[in-house]
Amino acid sequence: MDAIRNGNFTSSEIFRLMKSGKAKGSWSVDAYTYIEECNRERRLGRSIEVVTDARPLSWGKCVEKRAFDVLGLEYTLCSDVTIQHPTIPFWLGSPDATDPIAVSDLKCPLTLTSFCQMVDPYYEDHKLVHEGLTIEAVRENHKDGDKFFWQIVSNGILTGRKKGKLIVYVPYYEELEEIKSIADGNPDYYWIWSADESKLPYLIKGAHYKNINVIKFDILQRDVDALTTRVLEAGEYLITV
């Protein structure tokens, strides 16, 4: 992970600042915990995060290459680039992709349960009907829905985009061979390359679900203002080392 992220607020964790406490207008315990974690990283000069189960992360990194092949050329993959807010230096993010009007976050869940929780509200009679719904369905239906929402809002602010996209991808069975080819030779992905196909998440082509699901929404000014205000307030608690 890019060292510049250490000790700063990042899009992937910024949802923690938006949690409210029990009293009206108060902050949650998790918000204060996040600020303290950033301060510890500042004192340590390194990340305090220790990944105990790297498989969900490595699956996502491996499979995103295939996902963007499926999505097409309108998207620019930028997940390895860290963007800093132009006037708030302790606010950073690494969006997965951008296109001319939107910023996108790609989710490649390792479990089919997580996939279904994200996309089920957008299906009706075996048809994808997400155009008539909003990101709110994910926020209500998935345990990390609020995290996904604020991550995209944050990256929208950092990239100057007014629209967000949550892209949810699970490969069809026929795509697993290509994914194993991507994994071949990379020690981080060895478990993917060596796994029996039945042990990997995949969909049956022509059944209920599509492999690519794009959920679009407007990034509202009220959310931009609320997040910006909260980041600035939280920044007052960051130490200088």
Where would I find each of the regions flagged by the language model?
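Charged, glycine-rich intrinsically disordered N-terminal tails and low-complexity linkers that flank
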Residues: M1-C62, R66, M118-H142, Y173-S181, ...
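Nucleic-acid nuclease catalytic cores
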Residues: E74-P95, D99-R230
